[in-house]
């Protein structure tokens, strides 16, 4: 059984600064990290590996220069995957979800797999599209919002997902793609032994040409700005008479 778990490198929000002049966001000093939602996907894949015993877990990502960071690669591999495959090109920095999915699908097809696991979305865009789009690109079953994996055999996957007013139990044939929610598990913190052992695990670096892609269409960011902060008026209305109630209503109208 070969399981691919996909992840995205995103800017660490703690390092993002706001330019006081125009409110735009400054990413220049922001380190990259694994998208928080993808940590659940990695953990889910590694838990399946422990249950099955003979499974192989491959971490996979497409992106720009952030994927060249040795510390970032080590972080991923320390969390349990046996191998890492990255497809690197500057064009992926601003790739739209469908083009990211196309690249992941091509890379997964080249690698070979039985099950592909994604997070429900990414910490930066949270488009919640890539997992299902990968399934569409490969023409295989895909399910999002998976909150529990009930069973996995050589031919069938059974999962559970919580909807607004019901819980669904779904069985699909392999190969398949699932996008897992944060309810599925709590990602573990890697041990020191796992961190040291991560440096010995294999890493494959591919280009778009290696997976049959010539160019990657991208979106153009016009501006990313923080919402303008409004100064609090600090209006205090004392009492509970009709005049105070009328004053309260009038102040509410001003802010609606």
UniProtKB/Swiss-Prot annotation:
Keywords linked to the UniProt accession: Electron transport, Transport
Listed SMART domains: ETF
Gene Ontology biological process terms from the UniProt entry: carnitine metabolic process
A single GO molecular function term of this UniProt record: electron transfer activity
InterPro entries: ET-Flavoprotein_bsu_CS (IPR000049), ETF_a/b_N (IPR014730), ETF_b (IPR012255), ETF_beta_N (IPR033948), FixA (IPR023463), Rossmann-like_a/b/a_fold (IPR014729)
Pathway: Amine and polyamine metabolism; carnitine metabolism
Domain of life: Bacteria
Pfam families: ETF (PF01012)
Function: Required for anaerobic carnitine reduction. May bring reductant to CaiA.
Family per record: Belongs to the ETF beta-subunit/FixA family.
Subunit organization: Heterodimer of FixA and FixB.
NCBIfam families from the UniProt entry: PRK03359.1
Name of this protein: Protein FixA
The species this protein was found in: Salmonella paratyphi A (strain AKU_12601)
